[in-house]
Amino acid sequence: MSSKAFRTQIENRNYLSSIGFKFNLAKYPKVDFFSNSAIIPQLTLATAIQPTYLKDIDVPGEKLSFGDFTLKFLVDENMENYMAIYDWLVGLGFPESTQEFKDITTDSADQRDLKEAFCDGTLRILNSNLREIAKVKFQDLFPVSLTSLDFDATNSDIEYFTADVAFKYTVYNIVDTKGDPL
């Protein structure tokens, strides 16, 4: 057998674990510590139709469509991580006044910058030894939904709150630990 054949075979036979991940948002560091579920979004390529005499044929050539990025996180006792997302979402929707939008789109130098409404995020994928092996880098994230917190005094066991947040974004890339494409 040639040495070339050995290079094309799988070297690591361990399987990727669903519990091996960490997520962080550049502007909101309190959210990452409590994350307990994340979904790498669906990626869909629409097709163009090439008409032919017998049958229309699908061919690649349309736009890529990225699904929402959803994250489930444990809500801390002071609700700091929940309120970070809540305030961000309310600021984007400005339900009471346009000042809320101005507050979220003003940078630390008191200059208007619409990029302040967005935030980059990184999902770090870990191996079976909990060492980082890859990153999913999301560009220009912004929240579009945040689940409710349902208080219930009839629960006999202590249940800790989790919240789901859905983000829209521009694009995501999967890179190695150095930032190079896989």
Regions found by a protein language model. Give the residues of each.
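Glycine-rich, low-complexity intrinsically disordered segments
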Residues: 1-182
